[in-house]
Design a protein with these regions (language model features):
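Basic, polyanion-binding surface patches
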Residues: 1-96
């Protein structure tokens, strides 16, 4: 059992047919709205969320505190999302 081997604790979601891993600082519970097997594109809807207070700033998830991990398929590695590289709705304004 991978869950037991990892040493994490789970409980059943009240909203979707999936386990909730209690040690995760952020959980987004989603339902599938559509899936295109030809492209692999999946569209989902978030139906519930749980966030640990430690990753929030003014009630909003703070990526710097969360330190999300992404999978890099090109190098088959996991990476931590890091530095700010731009500011939305501001940096592109001079290009108009």
């Amino acid at each position: 059992n991978k869950i037991e081997h990892a040493g994490v604790h789970v409980h059943k979601s009240a909203h979707v047919n999936a386990p909730i891993i209690e040690e995760y600082p952020l959980t987004l519970e989603c339902t599938v709205k559509s899936y295109d097997p030809a492209t692999g594109i999946l569209v989902g809807a978030i139906v519930a969320e749980q966030a640990d207070e430690a990753i929030l700033t003014d009630g909003v998830v703070d990526a710097a505190k969360l330190k999300p991990i992404v999978f890099d398929i090109a190098t088959r590695t996991y990476r931590v999302v890091g530095d700010v590289v731009g500011h939305a709705w501001r940096d592109g304004l001079p290009l108009r």
